[in-house]
């Protein structure tokens, strides 16, 4: 859909302030546009009545979604849509208030009311379906085992989650088929979720929205196990092939069994199937639903439900097993530790890259610390900005500054040509250096795939030198080595663990010449162990423990799609 010639999109200021009264006392609300809400290549998908898929790329340079605070209240927060009047919530003196326009003709009057005065459809406690004994996708270490080094604290940047939301047909029906209303609500929810995760030093950017306006693409059932697995499989085999993203959630109008209103896999962020959650759209209050969305995404980041020893001050915490009567947007100390433990130990690589401004579909907001369309920099709110190069109020560079962001920016100037900006990760990955003409580090370049490495023990593959010894060490630790060739014959069985690849869900046994491109076998010589054919297998992730692509399987040969092929023709 294109805008008619001459039509002008409404202009929403980067920063605004409003004055009104709460409990008879004047308050000043300061708002800053959330410029990291949408990516530049944000796309929306819905379906025509005849079933055709319709993809649009709405303009996102200007939008009306803001974060903010109340003047003279350091603990205050706000998440507001200013599209048609002010709609959203703010916290003032530890109380949650909602604001929305009164539906009166020719009037700009608004209603302000406390959360406790909102009519609630059902007072029964609502809860997440994940139980404490529910098996993690990856084990989470005890909090006492986590320790950040000074180097890690210095160089660990913000993480960026490219978020995709899918809305089921039941939600479309509940909203009388009004797609614009649904989109506006999804933007408001994403704005709140992004604000919540900033407390964990993460940014959540909406990169896509799909509305099942002509029928669900999976069978959505009250059984959360069934629906979560179905959505995860659809995401892996369908959605990911069409749109790059890190994490997806299904928002559904169906009433899940029992008091459950959300469900997700634990420790699965970046997994092609399991980086998902499902959320019941059970409340008309955006804050309530956004907290559930943040809660389920927290599980994907390795965070378990809070126990009695966890705290986030005097507020209820995001990861409590039940949804509080007055939900807050704070993660507990336990959540922070578990999240960063998961990131540091399991390295979910998809959340390292900052999304292109063109990837974020929600409208840009100045002050959300995401660099988006129209911004030269974004260092957060004026109160929190610690970037001397950036004007936080406008998201423009200060006079005399060449840059305010990037690995090749030092003291607001481009780094000198030749300055190393990305270290070598292996002999197959040379270091990159600044050009002196840009604040960004040049693209990561690798040596050619198939080039010999590690004294001919391996061949370069996508910047790494994969060899079986290193893979055994990663799985089992020290004193573990590549097993004898006889162990690999088990891969000819085609059973639950011994195979070379999967085709249409079926495990294909290895041909004799391909056995070293299936399950990895290691010889364990560690104290108390004497296992000549040790292997790793997990129902949660069947692929883990397989020989990695590009690994040397014979002289002059490497693994490719479960075959041991000539390195000269593999790439």
UniProtKB/Swiss-Prot annotation:
Q: Which organism is it from?
A: Bothrops jararaca
Lineage from the top down?
A: Eukaryota, Metazoa, Chordata, Craniata, Vertebrata
Active site, per annotation: 296
Quaternary structure annotation from Swiss-Prot or TrEMBL: Monomer (Jararhagin and Jararhagin-C) and dimer (Jaracetin).
Q: Which SMART domains match?
A: ACR, DISIN
Q: What is this protein called?
A: Zinc metalloproteinase-disintegrin-like jararhagin
Q: Quote the tissue specificity entry.
A: Expressed by the venom gland.
Cellular compartments per GO CC: extracellular region; plasma membrane
| Residues that coordinate or bind Ca(2+) 1 | 162, 246, 350, 353
């Amino acid at each position: 859909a294109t805008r008619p010639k001459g039509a002008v999109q409404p202009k929403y200021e980067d920063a605004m302030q409003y004055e009104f009264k709460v409990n008879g006392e004047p308050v000043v609300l300061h708002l800053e546009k959330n410029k990291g809400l949408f990516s530049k290549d944000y796309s929306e998908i819905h379906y025509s009545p005849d079933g055709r898929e319709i993809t649009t790329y709405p303009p996102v340079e200007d939008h009306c979604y803001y974060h903010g605070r109340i003047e003279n209240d350091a603990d205050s927060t706000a998440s507001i849509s200013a599209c048609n009047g002010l709609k959203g919530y703010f916290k003032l003196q530890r109380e949650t208030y909602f604001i929305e326009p009164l539906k009166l003709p020719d009037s700009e009057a608004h209603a302000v009311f406390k959360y406790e005065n909102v009519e609630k459809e059902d007072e029964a406690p609502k809860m997440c379906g994940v139980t404490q004994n529910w098996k993690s996708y990856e084990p989470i270490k005890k909090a006492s085992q986590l320790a950040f080094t000074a180097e890690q604290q210095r160089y660990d940047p913000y993480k960026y989650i490219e978020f995709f939301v899918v809305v089921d047909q039941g939600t479309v029906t509940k909203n009388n088929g009004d797609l614009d209303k649904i989109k506006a609500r999804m933007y408001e929810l994403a704005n709140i979720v992004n604000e919540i995760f900033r407390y964990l030093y993460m940014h959540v950017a909406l990169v896509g929205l799909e509305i099942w306006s002509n029928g669900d693409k999976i069978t959505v059932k009250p059984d959360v196990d069934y629906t979560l697995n179905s959505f995860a499989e659809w995401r892996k085999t369908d959605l990911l092939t069409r749109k790059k993203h890190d994490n997806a959630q299904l928002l559904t109008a169906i009433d899940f069994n029992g008091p459950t209103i959300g469900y997700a896999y634990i420790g699965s962020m970046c997994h092609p199937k399991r980086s998902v959650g499902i959320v019941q759209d059970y409340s008309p209050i955006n804050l309530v639903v956004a907290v559930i969305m943040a809660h389920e995404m927290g599980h994907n980041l390795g965070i378990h439900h809070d126990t009695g020893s966890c705290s986030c001050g005097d507020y209820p915490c995001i990861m409590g097993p039940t949804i509080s009567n007055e939900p807050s947007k704070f993660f507990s100390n336990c959540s922070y530790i578990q999240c960063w433990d998961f990131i540091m130990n399991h390295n979910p690589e998809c959340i390292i890259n900052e999304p292109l401004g063109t990837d974020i579909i929600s409208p840009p907001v100045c002050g959300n610390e995401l660099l988006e369309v129209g911004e030269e920099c974004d260092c957060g709110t004026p109160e929190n900005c610690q970037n001397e190069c950036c004007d936080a109020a406008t998201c423009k560079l200060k006079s005399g500054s060449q840059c305010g962001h990037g690995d090749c920016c030092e003291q607001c100037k481009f780094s000198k040509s030749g300055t190393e900006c990305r270290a070598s990760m292996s002999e197959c990955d040379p270091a990159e250096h600044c050009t002196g003409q840009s604040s960004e580090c040049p693209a990561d370049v690798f040596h050619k795939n198939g080039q010999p490495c590690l004294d001919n023990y391996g061949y370069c593959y996508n910047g790494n030198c994969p060899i079986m010894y290193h893979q055994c060490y990663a799985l089992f630790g020290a004193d573990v080595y590549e097993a004898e060739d006889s162990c690999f014959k088990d891969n000819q069985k085609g059973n639950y663990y011994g195979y070379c690849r999967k085709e249409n869900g079926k495990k294909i046994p290895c041909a004799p010449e391909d056995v070293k491109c299936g399950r990895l076998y290691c010889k364990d010589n560690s104290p108390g162990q004497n296992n000549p054919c040790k292997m790793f297998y997990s129902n949660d992730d069947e692929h883990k423990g397989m020989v990695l692509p590009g690994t040397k399987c014979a002289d002059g040969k490497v693994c490719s799609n479960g075959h041991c092929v000539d390195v000269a023709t593999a790439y």
